[in-house]
């Protein structure tokens, strides 16, 4: 036997009859036609009490062709016991058995009505367009240090070095200061970086000369009345005021270079005995002609 679902109509001759699926265990090769209503009598199996269904006309030739009665006769083999779970179902003429829609209640496999055996469910083939994923690659050896360093993100490149202003490198080199040699003629206009180069050289020369003058003024001021206690030092610092006036004129670069030769840093030389005043050179005597303001705290114009 095979458990199947079969379609059944609610009415045989009604055009508006509805269809429903009826669960049965009927085999398709045991159907008997009723001559009166044009229906089939379905038996569940061929061992149903070993009784066969036949038409009355087959047994008695005098019977009416419209006789609806069904007679049974004993079979030749041993009778089987009747089972309450077995039933007979009627289907209208023209009904079809949908083998493609018959599924077992367990496992979802398709049933065959010919022999009552259950066919295994077919596996769905993979789609043609989908490519099979490659198996995961298993490393045969641990990664080396070079591979580990290659996986790390590269550090950002160092920012480009900022270009130095024109003339700054020559000033830091410690060489003598000199203005730009271009243009050659005195009345020609400056162009390019000439203006910025000459400006940087001028500022460096003034800075060196002013540093030398400040060192000389500070040394002279300290020698006038050197403090001897912390209280004297505080009073001295409050009263000290040194003003530097740079007026070398055209000799600015010469004075700056001479200062650079005596003190490479542009300041007064600091010997083992402390600060020593620079000797009075011709350029220094010319710079002393530029007198500071009258209210200046320290004036060394008359100092010998």
UniProtKB/Swiss-Prot annotation:
Keywords: Host cytoplasm, Host Golgi apparatus, Host nucleus, Phosphoprotein, Virion, Virion tegument. It is found in: Virion tegument; Host cytoplasm; Host nucleus; Host Golgi apparatus. A motif (Nuclear localization signal) lies at residues 160-163. Highly phosphorylated in the host cell. Packaging is selective for underphosphorylated forms. Residues 280-289 have a biased composition (Basic residues). GO terms for cellular component: host cell cytoplasm; host cell Golgi apparatus; host cell nucleus; viral tegument. Transmembrane segments: none annotated. InterPro entries: Herpes_UL49. Residues 143-154 have a biased composition (Low complexity). A motif (Nuclear export signal) lies at residues 233-245. Residues 123-142 have a biased composition (Pro residues). Coiled coil: none annotated. Residues 43-58 have a biased composition (Basic and acidic residues). Its main location: virion. Residues 23-68, 112-184, 262-304 are annotated as: Disordered. Tegument protein that plays different roles during the time course of infection. Participates in both the accumulation of viral mRNAs and viral protein translation at late time of infection. Modulates the RNase activity of the virion host shutoff protein UL41 probably to ensure necessary levels of key cellular mRNAs and proteins. Plays a role in microtubule reorganization that occurs after viral infection by stabilizing microtubule network. Belongs to the alphaherpesvirinae VP22 tegument protein family. Interacts with gE (via C-terminus); this interaction is necessary for the recruitment of VP22 to the Golgi and its packaging into virions. Interacts with gM (via C-terminus). Interacts with VP16; this interaction allows the formation of a tripartite complex composed of VP16, VP22 and UL41/VHS. Interacts with the capsid-binding protein UL16. Interacts with host CGAS. This is Tegument protein VP22. It comes from Equine herpesvirus 1 (strain Ab4p). The lineage of its organism: Viruses, Duplodnaviria, Heunggongvirae, Peploviricota, Herviviricetes.
